[in-house]
């Protein structure tokens, strides 16, 4: 069984993307492809908090 098609992440196709991490980013208040462009941009955490935000 093959996995899902690679996601286009920040303009780069990445095979075997960690979908659990993607879902967690969303749960942390991030957005998943908010304009349906097919490209996701997830910002890593900055500052001293425990939550990473994600915005396209």
UniProtKB/Swiss-Prot annotation:
It catalyses: Endohydrolysis of (1->4)-beta-D-glucosidic linkages in cellulose, lichenin and cereal beta-D-glucans. It is found in: Secreted, Extracellular space. The keyword Secreted applies. The keyword Disulfide bond does not apply. Its main location: secreted. Keywords: Carbohydrate metabolism, Cellulose degradation, Glycosidase, Hydrolase, Polysaccharide degradation, Secreted. GO terms for cellular component: extracellular region. Has avicelase and carboxymethylcellulase activity. This is Endoglucanase Cel5A. It comes from Gloeophyllum trabeum (Brown rot fungus).
